[in-house]
C-alpha cells in the first residue's frame, strides 16, 4: 500500500495498491454477483442510477469484506488512528450508471474518515472543491484500480462524484470510519 498526501484544495490522500491484483480480481468477481443499475429501473432517480449494498458495523462479513475491513484498519493506523472501542467501520459496495452525478456536499458529522476504493478498470475519481458552490480550486482524485482516495472528515471537505464522462458502470467500495454505534443513512437527494 503506497500513500501519497495531497494538500489542495484541502488535505487528502491517494492510495495505490490498497488491494493486491488478486484481491482486485476477487472484488470484481464479487461485484459481478450484485445488481447493476440500468438508468431506467427504479422509482427514484437515485435507484435508477445507483445501487448500493450497505455493510453495517454489526452485520456479519464474508471473507472478502472482512479482509477489506482489516486492510482499512491498517490504512487508518497510518493516516489517522483506529480504535475498536471508539470507532466502527461501514462499507458500501456502489455501482453507478454512466451519466449520473451526486451533489457537492460534506460528509455526515458521525463520519471520521472516508476512503473510496476504485474497482472498475476505468472511471473518474472523487471531485474535491474549495467551496460548497464549486467555485475556487478543484481537484479530481486520480482513478487507480485497486487503490483510491480518502480524507479525514472535517469542516470544509466539500466533494462530489459523477459518471458523466464514463461509458461503463462505476464500481467502488466506500469505506467509512464512524463514531462508535452510529450509522450513516443516506438521503435520496
Range-by-range predicted roles:
Residues 2-82:
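Non-heme Fe(II)/2-oxoglutarate
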Residues 73, 77-188:
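Catalytic core of non-heme Fe(II) oxygenases with the double-stranded beta-helix
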